[in-house]
């Protein structure tokens, strides 16, 4: 059986964390979740710890970091942890539902069943699909993506 891990970095995601974890855990393929919490002062880590002990024992994991170290640096210990624990498939997503958890199924299918070594989701395939972002952030992200492809 192949193992699948979703890495979710968090900072002050108390309002979303239980819902995003539940959404991923309820998917049919048995995903595991690794939360990388940057010392959220709002109690995000406490919610995750409770879910680890009561609801998702063995499938929910957490790395707590001291202080807000940033999104990019959160993925490094997450990927190292996934490799150390020999996960076959590693995914990353945001805690605020700006990524649709159902898309994990499509990404998994691309790698497991269609022969892709890497599958990358984009908010800009088939139009812009961004949730909970102000228009300025959407435009900046969209044009930054276009610029990177051009360069």
Regions found by a protein language model. Give the residues of each.
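N-proximal low-complexity "stem/linker" segments adjacent to membrane-targeting elements
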Residues: 1-23
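Short loop->beta transition adjacent to catalytic acidic/histidine clusters or analogous donor-positioning motifs
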Residues: 2-4, 25-35, 43, 59-60
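Acidic helix N-cap motif at the loop->helix transition within catalytic regions
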Residues: 15-19, 42-51
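Residue-level signature of catalytic and energy-coupling elements of molecular machines
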Residues: 17, 24, 78, 96
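Short beta-strand/loop segment that forms part of the nucleotide-sugar
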Residues: 21, 30-40, 63-64, 93
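Conserved hydrophobic residues forming the short capping helix/wall of the S-adenosyl-L-methionine
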Residues: 28, 48-53, 82, 111
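A conserved acidic beta->alpha catalytic loop
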Residues: 37-46, 97
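Acceptor/aglycone-binding surface of glycosyltransferases and processive sugar-polymer synthases
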Residues: 63-84, 89, 101-151
